[in-house]
Amino acid sequence: MIDAGDANPNLILILTDDQGYGDLACHGNPVIRTPSLDRLHAEGVCFRHFHASPVCSPTRASLMTGRYNFRTGAIDTYLGRSMMHPDEVTLPELLGAHGYRTGIFGKWHLGDNYPMRAMDKGFQEALVHNGGGLAQPSGRPGDGYFDPVLSHNGVWAKHSGYCTDIFTSAAIAFIARHRAEPFFVYLATNAPHMPLQVADEYSGRYLAMGLDEETAKTYAMITNIDDNVGRLLASLKELGLERNTIVIFLTDNGPAVSRGVDRFNAGLRDLKGSVYDGGIRVPCFLRWPARLQAGREIDEMAAHIDLLPTLLDACGAPLPDGLRLDGISLLPLLLGAAAPWPERTLYFQWHRGDEPEPYRNCCARSDRYKLVNGTELYDLIADPGEQRDIAADHPEIVARMRAGYEAWIEDVSATRGYAPPRIHLGTLHENPVTLTRQDWRGAEGWGNEHLGYWEVKVATAGEYDITLRFSARLPAREAHFRLGDNSLSQALDEGATACVFQRVPLPAGDARLEAWLEADGRRRGVSYVDLKR
């Protein structure tokens, strides 16, 4: 139970992007400088075996819903497979209903258009970039880590400074404005995700140590994050909010490391995208001075799906009747309760494609054993580096864990299937709508050589102005647009970068939207489609 004086604690969830378990000094990295995160680790409670999904959107969906990402629609990172279904109930929605002020600063990556944006899913304030990161096809032209173009509550504008500094400053300002109310801040940095862009004052320190450029810049971006965490913690103290604020730090998956680069990973096997522990075991520590004993470490296994029920439990916020969660509250563990902890098995899977394939890049993990791809078995107590496959010695464990996995994949797949949610056109919530290659379907990439389409819902019948935007470098003689029975084309002048179709009548309903360029019989995708009712 939570004392009345400690009810409704403030919540700050810090999630970094592609920072691995070994990318912290407190986890044994002999090179990186992370004093603020080390302090948070020392002053909080640390989960030694905390797990996320192998890549980012799936982790974010599970954090926001307390459910396995396969239930939510967010099964991958792009091509329409990172959009979370709008009927999923989210942590900020539940906290907002409990009287919390809610704000997100940084990376959402669960849908760029209505009704799937962060501002549609419970965040009352949202300063975010599109898609999976800055300087990607989902972003606005001229995007980058310095002076980025960001959406603030749906309004796009260029912001001065470095992305992580901007997001942290906005979070601190939000906290100051709402210090008299309980608040939930989701500070989700896009750093240290590639491209590796950071000030020379940060990277120079690591380059001087003789590190390769990739590692040096990655560590530099993490040290910048650490400096910003220090600013955030200092602001809590200055505002008198430190005691009853829960600060959670974790990362979204294992480290992203290029082939041939040797980076410290605390002895864990493999990297981002893998279901070996190097891909899914992540740092996680929580500081709550009012209730948690500093310096404790928890050996019990936990995962991203557990944070929503844990935080709701800490806040006394109720769950809606009938809402099914996969996670469980970790609050008894955090408070040091002596009650026995239930045994359970967690499941993780990720690969490209429109739906999961059984036994492809998957694992089932209990407190002791881990089954990888249905055939490899590891004793994680005796072999935390997952080097010795003992499947042949324990066929009964393999059979039991395979049965558990098969029941799990059938269950999560039956939730709603894997058809993507539709982007809505012509609503009051978003007009105009900009479609990007982030969410197109039918391709296996988002480069100029690829061609895709968008699954949309025309919410309001009427006339729309439609603009196709593209690079002048592309050879193109004609621009084409098609939605339902509407099929339009227009000749292009040499060097053109846009094509406008005016007052196009679109009927209400579900439809497939296509837009492409054509030259010499070859089709290429456009960069953006803008639709204004």
Feature roles, as predicted:
Residues 1-373, 380-410, 417, 434-450, ...:
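Formylglycine-dependent sulfatase
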Residues 398-533:
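Extracytoplasmic
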